[in-house]
Design a protein with these regions (language model features):
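Hydrophobic C-terminal alpha-helix "anchor/cap" residues
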Residues: 16, 20-21, 77
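A short amphipathic beta-strand at an alpha->beta junction
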Residues: 79-98
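Structured, soluble regulatory/oligomerization domains located on the cytosolic or IMS-facing side
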Residues: 15-17, 26-29, 66
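Short edge beta-strands and adjacent turn/loop segments
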Residues: 23-57, 92-95
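Short, non-transmembrane amphipathic alpha-helical segments
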Residues: 62-81
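N-terminal presequence-like segments and adjacent domain-start helices
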Residues: 1-18
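Short coil/turn segments at secondary-structure junctions
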Residues: 3-4, 56-60
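Short beta-strands and strand-coil junctions in structured, solvent-facing domains, enriched
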Residues: 59-62, 97-98
Length: 98
């Protein structure tokens, strides 16, 4: 019997959030201001696009943190769900105050 399995979008979003939170320099994730707009948005087949909204730790280098989030999220989604995103967009919405 042949078939395929897919992972629900909310599970992929949870995986992406977990991976992002592990990156040094990420103080947290920022929920959207509109209803049902989470901190992680997944779109396209097999999580082709992932968009994360983060709060950056005070003094953390935004470019380096963003690149590390991109790498870790892509690697983690591929390892856990077999879906490597084509794009991982990291949006810094807030900076944590010391």
């Amino acid at each position: 019997m042949e078939g395929s399995a897919s992972v629900a979008t909310d599970v992929l979003a949870s995986y992406a959030a977990d991976a992002a939170r592990e990156v040094e320099g990420v103080a947290g994730l920022v929920e959207g201001r509109l209803p049902r707009q989470g901190a992680v948005r997944i779109s396209g087949d097999d999580a082709a696009t992932v968009e994360l909204h983060v709060e950056l730790a005070w003094g953390a280098p935004a470019q380096e943190v963003g690149q590390e989030v991109q790498r870790r999220v892509a690697d983690y989604l591929e390892r856990m769900a077999g879906a490597r995103p084509l794009t991982v967009d990291v949006v810094v919405d807030e900076i944590a105050h010391p």
